[in-house]
Amino acid sequence: VAVLSGIKNALREHLAKPSQLYWLLTTININLSNDLPIYNINGCSLHFYKFLPKKYRKARESIISEMASWLINKDDSSSYYITARVREKSEYDAATRMLDAIDLLRGIWNLHINKTMVFSFGGRKKPINQVTLGALHTLHDKNGDKASNTFWYDPEHYENHSHVDFAVNAYKTIEFTKNVRKLLKKNSYGKDVEIAIIRYVRALDSQDYDAVVIKLWSILEYLTATLQENYDKTIKRTVFQYSDREYNKQVLEHLRQYRNRSVHLRSGGNDIETHVFQLKSYVEHLLRFHIANHFKFDSLQESAMFMDLQPDKVALKKQIALCRAGISFMTKA
């Protein structure tokens, strides 16, 4: 009882707090030759700068200088700076919302430009994502001063990632982003799809490919609404999307076995890149299916019912006839 009372009091105090504006500052590896628009995503305003805005300079440099040189390097002057702004009751809630908004945008970009297959020849693996954030994220107030002594640092950050140039992208990533955001806005379960996109981009930030396999399989379960189901159901619903179902069933069964080995043994074999990119392709296919939502499903669960249908036209026509007979019977009853 005392514990519950304490939780209720803490919640009451949190809700009573006045909201205030927070700014999160980080870097992103977009080539400075690109002109990026302002994005408003889920109540967060995202702005891009080719140079570090003066009001943040003192606080940002102070944080970097306080850390050991081996931990945090100076900002990359050839990368864009990005600020996110949101009104929230706490630093943690603000940072969480802003990073979610940034990663949703990055997820859409990477869904469009990530490569279908890349092989590395020895050495350290690099993230599959093309668009990545810098290692350091700092929180600021309206004057640019530190809003908190807390900062966010990615110890796995890959330093040598090349810069992305949307200007040479023949497929027009900015236009793709507009279209995806319009579709998500119209989608009845768009917020669920956004969660999947954020999970997708965070999974592919990692250089630990065994961890990537585990995370991608979890996203596959999420997108097929099989988190509480067995593996067979996950595979069955995924292969419904493909004409060559038997082949894809075998591939997914192999990936499932590899995923299980990764959980227990951290296999990291020579073929791990192939497995990562195969699994990534299934996740991306399902993401695009849910983003478009051509059949106007109301939820992930309803889309899962669609994927449970028999992939057989004759059987489906019989099912339709039975449903019509049932409606006729109920009408007469």
What do these predicted ranges mean?
Residues 213-246:
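Flexible secondary-structure boundary motifs
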Residues 1-211, 294-333:
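Charged, non-catalytic interaction/linker regions at domain boundaries
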Residues 193-196, 212-216, 220, 248, ...:
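Short runs of predominantly hydrophobic/aromatic residues within well-ordered alpha helices
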Residues 98-109, 220, 279-291:
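Short amphipathic C-terminal alpha-helix that caps PH/PH-like domains
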Residues 246-277, 281-288:
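Histidine-centered, metal-coordinating catalytic motifs and their short helical/loop contexts
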Residues 203, 207, 220-227, 286, ...:
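Generic structural signal for hydrophobic core residues of well-folded globular domains
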